[in-house]
Amino acid sequence: MDLRFIADAEPTPSERAALDDVLGSPGSSWEGGARLTGADGNTAAGGHAARAQRHLLLPALWALQERIGWISPGGLNDICRRLTVPPADAYGVASFYALFALEPRPPRVVHVCEDVACRCHGSQDLIAQLEERFGPEGELSDDGSATWHRSPCLGQCDRAPAALVSVAGDEPLERAQAPVTAAAVLDLLAGGEPGPSPAAPLPQAGDASLRLLRRVGVADAASIDDYRAHGGYAALRRAFELGPEGVLREVKDSKLVGRGGAAFPTGVKWEAVARQPARPHYLVCNADESEPGTFKDRELMEGDPFAVIEAMTIAAYATGCERGYLYLRGEYPEALHALEHALAEARARAFLGANVMGEGLAFDIEIRRGAGAYICGEETAIFESIEGKRGEPRNKPPFPVEVGLFGKPTVVNNVETLVNVLDVVLGSGPAFAEVGTEGSTGSKLLCVSGHVALPGTYEVRFGATLREVLDLAGGVPGGRPLQAVLMGGAAGGFLGPDDLDVPLTFEGARAAGTTLGSGVVLVLDDTVDLPRLLQRIAAFFRDESCGQCVPCRVGTVRQEEALARLRAGEPRGGVATELALIAEVGQCMRDASICGLGQTASSAVESAIRRLHVFQGEPA
């Protein structure tokens, strides 16, 4: 897109209608409306008025993407006029997100996952068949209406291999397809109707010991009455009885820590925001689980969406928030539909709005959809994205509890963390803390995928061993030997066959030199080419680095280059020299990167070299 000519570009009627749905009909002639304001008949919002609209940039870009399949110059120009955003700025935002196309693209696109879990289930063979029978990625169908692209993890690892089909138009359609075959993808590219979204495997469905997953697959996820019949909104009622201070006390006593990877004490975070005098306070639910191999939050949102809403409402009540944002991963269309329906039902029944349950609490939730940027799982990058900017992390301090979304005190928790709060409030903080271990209380959702007989989301008490989890999942199929387990996703670390008795706690994982991270347990049998897998992980971090800081921007590239040379058998200065370079680059990224992406970009690679002796001539 050549920005030199964008000023003369105009949107089509269809594009304008799509933007009207998000931004409202333009008022002034500057925005494309009929009202004349100003001596020359044009006016532009400035200062506070312009800043107040900027946060609508991402929803506006999504409106164009869904209507015509790409962001056209005319559409982008219209957005810039209406929101008073410079074209170069808007272009910089649009080009940051992988799901937005800035060049003409056919209305039908199939994204085929090529990441680690799908590779265990034949995605590379599937892609090879597509290249042979259809053409390379980006190739158009004979009628120009469809194409396909490779994709990083789509969060469907429990039913791999996976694809995501997107069909633009007046009634856009987006749907996950998993497990998928080459024949099915070819049918989609030929105009076939996407099948219904497959049900997630629920290996523990109906287990009376479940807490976080107790309603998933049991209660009707679309019915607020069924949710209430299964205990829904009892926790919110109890929260009103306790009062904000009582809720804070219970959450602190529970010793609940964040389940997204950082493991920060939830009660400490909530109390810090509640005590901030600046107003308003904001609540952000981080539902952008883009760590490869992670899918637990998706299954909570699809299978128990009212629980997410209830938990957010309790968090808002305890911390004094009047507005909540649920930042949802762009590749989760089914979760989007489930949450939109649940929000509408909750508003209709006064569980959201100006007077929640008649208790005087004013609180509502808005969904903000991400657009394919791994870095937006970082809490401050989410703020930037919601505010209509590139999702680049901020320097800390100041911390979000002081200066967060829109510069105000902000609570950020992920989906699993929030849903835990329901049990904390319904029971008590001390009762919650009795489950698990002293340093890791409660239960944990684990995303078990790869070479296991029964992949899926498993709920286990902290302290269970990796061996017990693999037994729950049926072990490695076909009697093949276990080669390794990737814990915590691409930002995590490897464990070997001798590490199966590691207790799955935060402290146990640290002692073993790995991490629980987002709960990924990716099982690899002896058929996996580990050097190739490591290069894929390195390529993932290279692609997903936002490029803001030099250590990460350069280090992720140098790491991948070194791994490529080692795989090709062409090390510079010998294998030991290359391994030393990887270690040095990794240390530099840990020490000097702004955010967790750079700080963990070498974790899996270095753990495989250290623990599994990859590239060192010993069997992995």
Residue ranges and their predicted role:
Residues 1-620:
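Feature of Fe-S/electron-transfer and energy-metabolism proteins
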